[in-house]
């Protein structure tokens, strides 16, 4: 029985563009995510 292809195809540029710091800072919701992670004390705020 054939399985589908692996869904995670790593790509650093896409990773940064979709989950990066500058992208997060663009929207109010994104800034809220970063703020929440700062409050929690996360070492890494964004990808």
Curated annotation (Swiss-Prot):
Q: Name one GO biological process term.
A: translation
Gene3D superfamilies in the record: 1.10.287.3980
Q: Does the keyword Transcription regulation apply?
A: no
Q: Kindly give the InterPro entries that the UniProt entry links to this protein.
A: Ribosomal_bL34 (IPR000271), Ribosomal_bL34_CS (IPR020939)
Q: Which key words tag this protein in UniProt?
A: Ribonucleoprotein, Ribosomal protein
Cite the Pfam families for this sequence: Ribosomal_L34 (PF00468)
In the UniProt record, does the keyword Chloroplast occur?
no
Q: Which family does it belong to?
A: Belongs to the bacterial ribosomal protein bL34 family.
Under HAMAP family, the record lists: Ribosomal_bL34
Q: What is this protein called?
A: Large ribosomal subunit protein bL34
Q: Which gene encodes it?
A: rpmH
């Amino acid at each position: 029985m054939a399985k589908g292809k692996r869904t995670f195809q790593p790509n650093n540029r896409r990773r940064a563009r979709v989950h990066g710091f500058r992208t997060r800072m663009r929207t109010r919701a994104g800034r809220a995510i970063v703020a929440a992670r700062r409050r929690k004390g996360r070492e890494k705020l964004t990808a």
